[in-house]
């Protein structure tokens, strides 16, 4: 069993080898899979207040919708039986697009955007779903260095200024050690949870992060 806590305003990076269970953990936090053992107490999940930014597939990158339509779809799980977006939802979508710097792209086709622009659109979509917590699965994979740093800067702003808790699965160890407050390392031989400094002093941290 692994044990960890994420509080309001925390920034947790989940790292470790491929196949160690990171994606399974994320799906359990989202309520898509039951935990293999133990329990998950996630008030944000019960309240429907989690924004999720998944890894993109090639088909998703080629999705033929406008930026505005993609962002508004973040409200889908909150609409219930309502088929149309409310004025408040449309206003919030515009606000989130402005916050992420994609407002001027709102009428553009999503599949025509660069990788960095698409990630910002998906993050605006996640904010429409999120009140308390953002969960991101490998958000910088495939991005060029400039787009990567831009995304990290945006996440830092949301975490520090808007007190949004962030849980990010990543293989970008350098970025994780720089941005996170805490590290959850999941390995085939065990796990570690603690601050960045504690992680770097641990056997797992010395193996995976000590060379950086």
Model-derived regions, located:
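Conserved ABC ATPase signature
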Residues: 109-113, 117
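H-loop/switch region of ABC-family ATPase nucleotide-binding domains
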Residues: 170-171
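Conserved ABC ATPase "signature" region
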Residues: 87-105
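Helix-to-loop junction immediately C-terminal to a conserved catalytic motif
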Residues: 30
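H-loop (His-switch) and adjacent beta-strand-loop-beta switch element
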Residues: 182-195
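Catalytic Walker B motif of ABC-type/P-loop ATPase nucleotide-binding domains
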Residues: 134-137
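The feature captures the beta-strand-to-loop junction immediately N-terminal to the Walker
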Residues: 15-17
């Amino acid at each position: 069993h692994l044990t960890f806590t994420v509080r309001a305003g925390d920034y947790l990076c989940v790292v470790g080898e491929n196949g160690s269970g990171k994606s399974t953990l994320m799906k359990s936090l989202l309520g898509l899979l039951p935990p293999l053992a133990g329990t998950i107490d996630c008030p944000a999940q019960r309240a429907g207040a989690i924004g999720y930014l998944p890894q993109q597939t090639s088909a998703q990158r080629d999705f033929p919708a406008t930026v505005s339509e993609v962002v508004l779809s973040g409200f889908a799980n909150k609409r219930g039986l309502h088929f149309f977006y409310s004025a408040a939802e449309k206003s919030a979508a515009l606000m989130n697009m402005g916050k992420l710097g994609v407002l001027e792209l709102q009428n553009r086709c999503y599949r025509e955007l660069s990788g960095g622009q698409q990630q910002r659109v998906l993050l605006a979509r996640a904010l429409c779903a999120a009140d308390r917590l953002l969960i991101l699965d490998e958000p910088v994979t495939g991005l060029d260095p400039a787009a990567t740093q831009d995304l990290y800067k945006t996440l830092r702003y949301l975490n520090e200024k808007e007190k949004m808790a962030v849980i990010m699965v990543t293989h970008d160890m350098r970025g994780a050690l720089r941005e996170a407050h805490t590290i959850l390392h999941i390995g085939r031989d065990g796990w570690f949870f603690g601050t960045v400094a504690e992680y770097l002093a641990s056997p797992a941290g010395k193996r995976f992060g000590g060379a950086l």
